[in-house]
Amino acid sequence: MWHAGAARQPSPAAARFPAGTRALVKLLHLSRRLRGLHRYDDFVIERVYGTPIVVTPSVFNPKRLRTGEFFASRLDRALIAPDAEVLDMGTGSGVCAVFAAKCARSVIAVDINPAAVRCAGINALLNRVEDRMVVRHGDLFQPVAGQRFDLILFNPPFLSGEPRNERERAWRSNGVAERFADCLDRHLKRNGAALLLLSTYGDAATFLGPLRRRGHRISVFAEGRYVGERLTVYRIAPLDPQGVS
């Protein structure tokens, strides 16, 4: 069951400040959070809504940057049917794959970072969903060539540029939006859809542009508002869901 959100107007507080000021505040928040990441480049165990999640060095922490925790909190049995086959792309620690595996028949989690692949595998075992969750190494759809899914989850890099190390791959990359849009339909089942999480730290319009140009239907599925940041989960579906073959 899907719940599409209605369009929302800027809050009165936001309207009081010029766009340039809001952009500067947003940049300062982001730089402070990214500068502090070296402190967390260690083995830790986080609890995400009561679920233990191991985070190993160079793997994106779902609580420190909050996106993984927010996304995982939206994955439940009201959304994911018991017979669903799910793809979690850019899985990182595997937090969304673990939450999806509690509901779905099967989940494939993929990541380009070998450390993330190992970390997600640990979390599948830790949370006893290894019988329904498989982790693969590779870039975007490459590890699932020829496979289709009822639901595709993607928390993509939100900054453009060349990553300097494996950890930066979680939030910095080039050309991801175009490659994702090019291949999405070939990996969706009939009536399937993708959930895409984007942050105001990035440029949502730029990321959604290739999907719009290819005729996908885009709606707001969930939103979270924080100091200096808004997270939005978009539901992406083909213009003709019955036309996916």
Please place each PLM-identified region on the residue numbering.
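A short alpha-helix capping/helix-coil boundary motif
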Residues: T21-R22, Y49, V54, F99-K102, ...
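SAM-dependent Rossmann-like transferase core, predominantly class I methyltransferases
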Residues: R32-C96, C119, G228-P241
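Residues at secondary-structure transition points
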Residues: P62-R66, T91, D111, A115, ...
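Conserved SAM/SAH cofactor-binding pocket of Class I
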Residues: A72-F154, S160-G161
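S-adenosylmethionine
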Residues: P114-V117, V129, V134-P238
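Rossmann-like AdoMet/SAM-dependent catalytic core
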Residues: G243-S245
